[in-house]
Amino acid sequence: MSFRSILLTALLSLSFTNTMQAAHHHYHRYDDKLRRQYHKKDLPTQENVRKEFCNPYSHSSDPIPLSQQRGVLSPICDLVSECSFLNGISVRSLKQTLKNSAGTQVALDWSILPQWFNPRSSWAPKLSIRDLGYGKPQSLIEADSPCCQTCFNPSAAITIYDSSCGKGVVQVSYTLVRYWRETAALAGQTMMLAGSINDYPARQNIFSQLTFSQTFPNERVNLTVGQYSLYSIDGTLYNNDQQLGFISYALSQNPTATYSSGSLGAYLQVAPTESTCLQVGFQDAYNISGSSIKWNNLTKNKYNFHGYASWAPHCCLGPGQYSVLLYVTRKVPEQMMQTMGWSVNASQYISSKLYVFGRYSGVTGQLSPINRTYSFGLVSPNLLNRNPQDLFGVACAFNNIHASAFQNAQRKYETVIEGFATIGCGPYISFAPDFQLYLYPALRPNKQSARVYSVRANLAI
């Protein structure tokens, strides 16, 4: 059965499914950052939460009054005319003024992540005669602990216009990663792991998003063009961002993913009902790293395709989300193999203080050393009602190692267990001690475990 037939069947079946018209939330990594509210003055009341969940769309056919319509120059004019934040400058008042006057939402995440790891040295696997044609002695791999990472991720969304013809929004997000001392990639080699100890194992610059989105009236259809990444939708609230949730590679993203970190393309998103979301799109196949915007690649006529379906019901326990992502990548010089991948995510609030999630993902081909992963976990937000940033989580991931992609693999599976506790300090700063336990490292047959201790300091505005 071809990928196109599978995708078409899945989308058609979901589009005709009768779902409950109730509270829902479709996860998007950068949209969620822009909407977050950690300041106590911004926290919504229970009544507002109920209204927001139960009426996320305004499906009224009545035209928007002229007094409420926004033209192209409205953001600039409104910002100049309303400078109330100057009476008392603060981060909250500045963000509120930008949102109300200029239709602009901004978010900034800056984290510092030192990680202590053990073991700190190992002997590289001995290459066989079959590999190189001759025997070669083992070499010693050493790394100094800790490795220190800093990650800077600003995001912004600017509403260009909002009228009876629809809404136009420009979104931008950039990720900058730097290291002191050792990198996480070298630390992972020292511990002989198949997966990294964090989401960004080396120095990186990623232009994750630069898009223009046209939302049509009734907000059921959205067309987006520009540079984007599937990482923004492939996951749930706490297993897709190492700055806010879990840190390890297998629990902070899809470890089997072979799609781009950011590439030019377009996608169409449709909401058949209030609790369902369907998306189909394509991207330039050549830009794998997403380090820059490469316009010339669009003329090379090789594209990756994806289909995405999400169902976000609201049951008696609370809101949840269940999604499926299917994608195909083409063979290009930067990625010398065509692949087909999938990712199934499920998350559910059992109560306001307990959130459970799971992921099953996989990929064909020999590009990724991890070709299947099964993960699950639970998170408790603000358990003590002390600070909105407080978060406690524990999760486990079982990674299936692809022997053909990892010639030195000594084991077929590698397991990571992780726990963390985020402690909020005011509305914007938090500290999170984190512990990772790796059982049966894939490349280290003489060791049963490896350990990583981390303390994440994060500024989230």
Curated annotation (Swiss-Prot):
Origin superkingdom? Bacteria
Q: Would you kindly state one Gene Ontology biological process term found in this protein's UniProt entry? A: amino acid transport
Q: What does the sequence similarity comment in the record state about its family? A: Belongs to the OprB family.
Q: Mind listing the UniProt keywords for this protein, alphabetically?
A: Amino-acid transport, Cell outer membrane, Ion transport, Membrane, Porin, Signal, Transmembrane, Transmembrane beta strand, Transport, Virulence
Q: Which residues form the signal peptide?
A: 1-22
Q: What is its main location?
A: membrane
What is the protein name given in its UniProt record?
A: Porin AaxA
Described purpose of this protein according to its UniProt entry:
Facilitates L-arginine uptake, as part of the AaxABC system. The arginine uptake by the bacterium in the macrophage may be a virulence factor against the host innate immune response.
GO annotation, cellular component aspect: cell outer membrane; pore complex
Which gene is annotated as encoding this protein in its UniProt record?
Answer: aaxA
Question: What are the top taxonomic ranks of the organism?
Answer: Bacteria, Pseudomonadati, Chlamydiota, Chlamydiia, Chlamydiales
Protein location: Cell outer membrane
Membrane topology reported for the UniProt record: Multi-pass membrane protein
What's a single GO MF annotation on this record? Answer: porin activity
